[in-house]
Amino acid sequence: MVLDHGAVVAGGWGVPVPWSGDADDLPSGYDDALVRAVQAREAGIPATTLSFMAVAVGSAHDKRGLATVVLQGLTRRAHEAGLVHVIAPLRPTWKHRYPMVPMDEYAAWVRPDGLSIDPWIRTHQRMGARVLGPAP
């Protein structure tokens, strides 16, 4: 959560899930991550990974880098809690502009600097993330 004079301007959340670190073992998306988190908790299976679920920034505070601040805070807290990995089943911001392009192709498009054409993927890449694959 990011505060500005006592008002919440940005925040986010994630769920702890067990994950082997193998791309083939990734949750298939938001719903699967949440189901895995609940099932693992109920079965006493320890989590190894934080799956980001959402980040929100108030529209009056957009374009100030607050999403990155929230993601960094969640990542820090995940590591402090002993989680080894952080994953983000994200929805690329500009994918709707290219409805006929398969997600895996879209996610591979890069600018001359080597970063994704998509601003939300780029935000994660600047934090050290890499695209592991599209959700089914």
Which residues are covered by each model-predicted region?
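Short alpha-helix
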Residues: 118-126
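Conserved acyl-donor/pantetheine-binding loop and adjacent beta-alpha core of acyl/acetyltransferases
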Residues: 12-54, 92-117, 135-136
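Active-site acidic-Proline motif in GNAT/NAT acetyltransferases
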Residues: 57-60
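Conserved acetyl-CoA-binding loop-helix of GNAT-fold acetyltransferases
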Residues: 63-80, 86-88
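Residue-level detector of anion-binding/catalytic polar loops
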Residues: 84-85, 130
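Conserved acetyl-CoA-binding loop of GNAT-fold acetyltransferases
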Residues: 125-134
